[in-house]
Amino acid sequence: MEQITKPHCGARLDRLPDCRWHSSMFAIVAFGLLVCWSNAVGGLILAQLKALGWTDNSTTATFSAITTAGMFLGALVGGIIGDKTGRRNAFILYEAIHIASMVVGAFSPNMDFLIACRFVMGVGLGALLVTLFAGFTEYMPGRNRGTWSSRVSFIGNWSYPLCSLIAMGLTPLISAEWNWRVQLLIPAILSLIATALAWRYFPESPRWLESRGRYQEAEKVMRSIEEGVIRQTGKPLPPVVIADDGKAPQAVPYSALLTGVLLKRVILGSCVLIAMNVVQYTLINWLPTIFMTQGINLKDSIVLNTMSMFGAPFGIFIAMLVMDKIPRKTMGVGLLILIAVLGYIYSLQTSMLLITLIGFFLITFVYMYVCYASAVYVPEIWPTEAKLRGSGLANAVGRISGIAAPYAVAVLLSSYGVTGVFILLGAVSIIVAIAIATIGIETKGVSVESLSIDAVANK
């Protein structure tokens, strides 16, 4: 039987010049993230259901909580399945679950049935997000992987304003009885297009195939990619610089995430995402209430909130420009310190002008960190053999903090006012900054294989 040599897919992918192939991988993943907005339409759907008498405050809380619970389970279990079945198969599977639950949910006869569908939507979405963000890093070269991942985050985060604009256009045209159903069918149809694109044009990750010892399949996919790049560029490919040791891949059991180097990365990734969830979700959900606590009326609170939130796409755009110019550890620590300091200063303001200006810059830095944490740093720190499981576990832990944070904010806002809330956010930011500085690893410009060798060898 012919001996099949290790194809060294990582080194071969990293030497590819930027071309249409990278852009096509980016476009498919970015489009998939942009249109999977079942979570983004949650508030819009609840408003319609309230008008129909389907929901009250208690049911609304259940609807929201069940979504978070589903995303928690999806992140946890989805990573396990994704590392077992592959990136392409996981992409298509989780899209199918998400689409089916949205379509079935759109025809729900009552609120209980819709809540059950909402849980499944959360499972599919939680698994899909882990797969797309983490899996995407295996296709991009180490030299500008952060820039590509930031671009994906930039496009994906337009889902919130996009679905809101669609809802604004539909509301005067469709009755409330059908409006909320259409709000679910639109992302389902668009996600079906994303699935078709993935089925037709998205190859399995050669790095994943190689990590499973499937050398022949990895070589076939890799050759197809290389031939396409040569056709697109019209130039021969640069020589391959092999960074790994040529040894056969090692199996990495789930238990390896709970010991040694991989445990340290679980702690690191969880801390990074805890800061993201606590800061981001607190500001998104509580900012209008915080404004009103400061004595600003409801109308002005909404205006201030809207103006501040323009910092979100601006922040991700800036992150996209600088991501591969600043070391990852330096960027994470720097952003968290800026958020802590600026948040405290923000809490002391009473002038509408200063609240608007400082709020804009605060949200800008927060969303630079969101891009850094969810799209770049946490997906990067895992070996290919355990990438989706590690990322999924860290995401699941991060989501727990997102569940607990609103209760802490409510207590602090009632007892200590706005300053108390921002002291909490600042404390979380500083603690995580210290964690990144002490146990963080540098991933800027580092090949996936270098990270894998270190982690797997010391698992």
UniProtKB/Swiss-Prot annotation:
Question: What Pfam families has UniProt attached to this entry?
Answer: MFS_1
Q: Which GO terms describe its molecular function?
A: transmembrane transporter activity
- What is the predominant subcellular site recorded for this chain? membrane
All ranges on the Cytoplasmic side of the membrane: 1-25, 82-90, 134-153, 203-271, 323-329, 373-399, 442-459
SUPFAM superfamilies, sorted: MFS general substrate transporter
Matching entries from InterPro entries are given as: MFS (IPR011701), MFS_dom (IPR020846), MFS_trans_sf (IPR036259)
Q: What is this protein called?
A: Putative metabolite transport protein YdjK
Which source organism? Answer: Escherichia coli (strain K12)
Q: What is the lineage of its organism?
A: Bacteria, Pseudomonadati, Pseudomonadota, Gammaproteobacteria, Enterobacterales
The primary gene name is: ydjK
